[in-house]
């Protein structure tokens, strides 16, 4: 049985990607330290330039044929499309929930993960905090996930603050996309679902710009990507939001998508994690899309639920794949139940929600 490391374990084993670092050895910084100005160290440009192995005044790149650049990009992308045409898990939406899900899933090197993101820039709304401010507020105990990523933060009694939300998003993306079992297909939209015999079996894809212009162009047929599990993390309602659950409603697999209620942070974050689940066979819903399908309150500019909902979705996917996971006791390690289910009721209540 494989041993994996997760921030939802109280005594994590060594990570398969960083055997010298525990998930719990983060680097929280006291608030007062943050308020002290940081002075840069003067750099001696003369010494630096002298140590360089080349002369910047006559710098030249190695020559290359333009066709080689084209072939390298095309060949590698086509190989990725072939490789991930039939994959283990497709995560639709690369916001904070989708990225957290893919990060947790891909710790198991045997699980092949494709991420579909309609935007050129992944990250969803997690590049900034509320109202375009910089800081990201994360309520405890989700700070354990930040510890695992090695992120610095200012620690308060019940929450922590990252000085810029982009630090979280850029850090998790750099760690995630370096893994050999992960491929991000950005600027690609999931236009539809593959559904066979009452089970979701993949997604229908197209270039995002094509999807946005179907009414102005002639028919441009899509492509497909089969998957054993689809994780829908498309966010709240919008042109490309909540598309997974809206499609389930339109084909009659669920009854309604009532939409999220007015803001209530304390209720919202617990509910989003608790209600993260497999809504129909083959499809798990995570992040703010959960609020759309269940009529939960919106949570506003706090991000802990996105991270832990994504982690929970990952373990639901692992369970569906028959692999060790934190939900059925097969995962190695002592669990922090609050990080798996938050304010969780029993499985029957979640299934009926």
From Swiss-Prot:
Keywords annotated in UniProt = Chloroplast, Iron, Metal-binding, NAD, Plastid, Thiamine biosynthesis, Transferase, Transit peptide
Q: SUPFAM superfamilies from the xrefs?
A: FAD/NAD(P)-binding domain
Q: What is its cofactor? A: Fe cation
The answer on whether this UniProt entry bears the keyword Chloroplast reads: yes
According to the UniProt record, what class of enzyme is this? transferase
Signal peptide start and end residues: none
Stretch forming the transit peptide: 1-48
- UniProt cross-references to InterPro entries, sorted A to Z: FAD/NAD-bd_sf (IPR036188), Sti35 (IPR027495), Thi4_fam (IPR002922)
Identify the domain of life.
Answer: Eukaryota
Q: Cite the EC number.
A: 2.4.2.60
Q: 2,3-didehydroalanine (Cys) is carried by which residues? A: 219
Q: How is the cofactor bound?
A: Binds 1 Fe cation per subunit.
* Post-translational note: During the catalytic reaction, a sulfide is transferred from Cys-219 to a reaction intermediate, generating a dehydroalanine residue.
Question: Record's Gene Ontology CC terms?
Answer: chloroplast stroma; cytosol
Q: Which Gene3D superfamilies does the record match to this protein?
A: 6.10.250.2840, FAD/NAD(P)-binding domain (3.50.50.60)
Which GO MF terms are attached to this record?
cysteine-dependent adenosine diphosphate thiazole synthase activity; iron ion binding
What is the recorded function of this protein according to its Swiss-Prot or TrEMBL entry? Involved in biosynthesis of the thiamine precursor thiazole. Catalyzes the conversion of NAD and glycine to adenosine diphosphate 5-(2-hydroxyethyl)-4-methylthiazole-2-carboxylic acid (ADT), an adenylated thiazole intermediate. The reaction includes an iron-dependent sulfide transfer from a conserved cysteine residue of the protein to a thiazole intermediate. The enzyme can only undergo a single turnover, which suggests it is a suicide enzyme. May have additional roles in adaptation to various stress conditions and in DNA damage tolerance.
Q: HAMAP family recorded for this chain?
A: THI4
Q: How does it assemble?
A: Homooctamer.
The family annotation for this protein states:
Belongs to the THI4 family.
Name of the protein described by the UniProt record: Thiamine thiazole synthase 1, chloroplastic
Q: Which organism is it from?
A: Vitis vinifera
């Amino acid at each position: 049985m494989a041993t994996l490391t997760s921030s939802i374990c109280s005594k994590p084993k060594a990570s398969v990607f960083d055997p010298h670092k525990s998930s719990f050895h983060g680097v929280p910084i006291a608030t007062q330290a943050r308020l002290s100005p940081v002075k840069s160290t003067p750099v001696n440009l003369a010494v630096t330039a002298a140590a360089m192995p080349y002369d910047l005044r006559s710098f030249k790149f190695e020559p290359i044929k333009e066709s080689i650049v084209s072939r390298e990009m095309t060949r590698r992308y086509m190989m990725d499309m072939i490789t991930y045409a039939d994959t283990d898990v497709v995560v639709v939406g690369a916001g904070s929930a989708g990225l957290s899900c893919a990060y947790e899933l891909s710790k198991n090197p045997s699980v092949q993960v494709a991420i579909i993101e309609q935007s050129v820039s992944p990250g969803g709304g997690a590049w900034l905090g509320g109202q375009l401010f910089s800081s990201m507020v994360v309520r405890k105990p989700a700070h354990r996930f930040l510890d695992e990523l090695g992120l610095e933060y200012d620690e308060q009694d019940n929450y922590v603050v990252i000085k810029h939300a982009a630090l979280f998003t850029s850090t998790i993306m750099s760690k995630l996309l370096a893994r050999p079992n992960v491929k991000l297909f950005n600027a690609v939209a999931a236009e539809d679902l593959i559904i066979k015999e009452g089970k979701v079996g993949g997604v229908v894809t197209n270039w995002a710009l094509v999807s946005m212009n179907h009414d102005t162009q002639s028919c441009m047929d899509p492509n497909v990507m089969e998957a054993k599990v689809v994780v829908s993390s498309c966010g709240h309602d919008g042109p490309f939001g909540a598309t997974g659950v809206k499609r389930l409603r339109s084909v009659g697999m669920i009854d309604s998508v009532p939409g999220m209620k007015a803001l209530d942070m304390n209720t919202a974050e617990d509910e989003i994690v608790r209600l993260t689940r497999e809504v129909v066979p083959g499809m798990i819903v995570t992040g703010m899309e959960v609020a759309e399908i269940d009529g939960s309150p919106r949570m506003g500019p706090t991000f802990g639920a996105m991270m832990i909902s994504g982690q929970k979705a990952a373990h639901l996917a692992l369970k569906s794949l028959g692999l060790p996971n934190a939900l059925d006791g097969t995962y190695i390690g002592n669990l922090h139940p609050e990080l798996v289910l938050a304010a969780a009721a029993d499985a029957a209540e979640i299934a009926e929600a």
